[in-house]
Design a protein with these regions (language model features):
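Phosphate-group recognition and catalysis centered on beta-loop-alpha active-site segments
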Residues: 2-157
Length: 157
């Protein structure tokens, strides 16, 4: 009976240890708490600057916002910042982002402006220059098996 009780107590302690939030995990989350987030950058109803543009990301960082954004791959495996799966709401293009090559995609104006969809790397540089302490929440959109190796490389980077 004592052995059974010891085993139960040991299992309970292990379970508690496994589900108890670690201090390190909480420390990693601290930059994300108590902050407002600019979804797709800081832009107005008139899309000036347009969402997902470098000026919108710079404005969010300069004004102390965290940023939530979406990235996905073009057909030639360039990682771009773009929320929608299709091009037609924010650009004059038609079809899916993953079917467009970077040269075609990057030439499309965002919301009729002079701004164009950015590469993820360019967005990172822009935000780092504006405010390097800006927390980012990045959603990786990928519905295609061919992007798996690129996503694995991205996660390792």
């Amino acid at each position: 009976m004592k052995i059974l009780l010891c085993v139960i107590l040991l299992l309970a302690a292990l379970l508690l240890f496994a589900v108890w939030p670690g201090k390190r995990r909480d420390e990693l989350r601290l930059p994300f708490y108590g902050r407002n987030y600019a979804h797709r950058g800081l832009f107005g109803k008139d899309q000036c600057p347009p969402e997902n543009s470098l000026p919108a990301f710079a404005a969010a960082a300069q004004n102390g916002y965290g940023i939530e954004l979406d990235v996905q791959f073009t057909s030639d495996h360039r990682l771009v910042v773009f929320h929608d799966d299709t091009l037609d709401r924010m650009t004059p293009g038609k079809g899916f982002v993953h079917d467009a090559a970077w040269a075609e995609f990057s030439a499309m104006p965002l919301a009729g402006s002079d701004d164009h969809p950015p590469l993820f790397a360019d967005m990172l540089r822009t935000v780092a220059e504006a405010n390097p302490a800006t927390p980012l929440i990045v959603e990786i959109k990928s519905r295609h098996e061919y992007t798996k190796p690129y996503l694995e490389d991205l996660c390792r980077a």
